[in-house]
Regions:
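Signature of N-terminal electron-transfer/Fe-S-associated modules in redox systems
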Residues: 1-199
Length: 199
């Protein structure tokens, strides 16, 4: 596993919005007395959804809410790669580069990200709209290569389709998730070859 550390530059403080604070307090009641620490992942996730990344002040705040030592919350945040430990752009592009996606051309997807976002991963684009990173399998191997933007999967990509996708996001559009090459779901690329009748 790679070494994961908090960003060098941190904000001065963190506070959940009133809505998220109420949500966090309710989330903690799902666990028996003395077991509120079980909510640590969901609270970190909610904090990341609020601010885009996990900060030291956020970890301190969550540790206080859950009556946990700071180091225990830090261990969770640095262990799970789903937590962003550095600032990210408005759109975080996560490119799958594991074997199925790589065999189907994820290198071209990475090259498009280098060209249209930043030459190195985990760097925010000059306009602040994007950052990108390579990730482990996202579970859409049948439609490889693919990437995730926000909570949506964009599949069956190549270099030009990835560039087109990023340009649409840059214009403020939200492209339709799923296959980008006109494939229907996970059917063969040329269309269904068996069981053609919909029952």
């Amino acid at each position: 596993m790679s070494l994961r550390r908090l960003a060098e530059h941190q904000p001065a403080s963190f506070a959940f919005t009133p809505e998220n604070q109420a949500w966090a307090e309710k989330e903690m009641t799902k666990y028996p007395a003395g077991r509120q620490a079980s909510a640590v992942i969901s609270l970190l996730w909610r904090g990341q959804e609020q601010d885009g990344w996990v900060t030291k002040p956020m970890i301190e705040q969550i540790a206080g809410l859950l009556s946990m030592p700071y180091i225990r919350v830090l261990e969770v945040a640095t262990f799970y790669t789903m937590f962003n430990l550095h600032p990210v752009g408005e759109h975080l592009v996560q490119v799958c580069t594991t074997t199925p996606c790589w065999l189907r051309g994820s290198d071209a997807v990475v090259d498009a990200c280098k060209k249209h976002i930043a030459p190195t991963p985990q760097t925010i684009s000059a306009d602040g709209k994007f950052s990108w990173m390579e990730v482990e399998c996202l579970g859409a191997c049948v439609n490889a290569p693919m990437l995730q933007i926000g909570k949506d999967f964009y599949e069956d990509l190549d270099g030009p389709l990835t560039e087109k996708l990023l340009e649409a996001f840059r214009r403020g559009e939200t492209p339709k998730p799923g296959p980008q090459n006109n494939r229907r779901s996970s059917e063969p690329e040329g269309g269904a070859t068996t069981l053609k009748e919909v029952v």
